Amino acid sequence: MTFRIVNPDALGRPSGWNHGMLAPAGGRLLFVAGQTAPEPGGGLVEQWAGALERVLEVVRAAGGGPEHIGRMTVYVIDRQTYLASLKPLGEVHRRLMGRHYPAMTLVQVQALLEPNAAVEIEATAVLP
């Protein structure tokens, strides 16, 4: 049970994400609430890893894996730090998600509810 990647030529080729992910028929939707690192603090890369690990923990608890995630929304408090951290963030992504790149939206926000949190990640997965 795999997603069909949808990247229309008119939108240009994405890097590290996909424009669309068509869910397989008969899949069950799992909505993962926004997750922050277990101990917010430290840098964006460390917090990103912690938040993504928690997202994956929920997906695994429901019987899925990274390949079942079709969409992620990432909230950051500092867009410039995100842009300056693309290489190490890509390394974290590949370590935790492999070469699976869901559709992704990144939003800069003024603050997150969790004090000292620099990033929060929510996801939607489609499980067999």
Regions found by a protein language model. Name each.
Residues 1-70, 76-128:
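N-terminal presequence-like segments and the immediate start of the first folded domain
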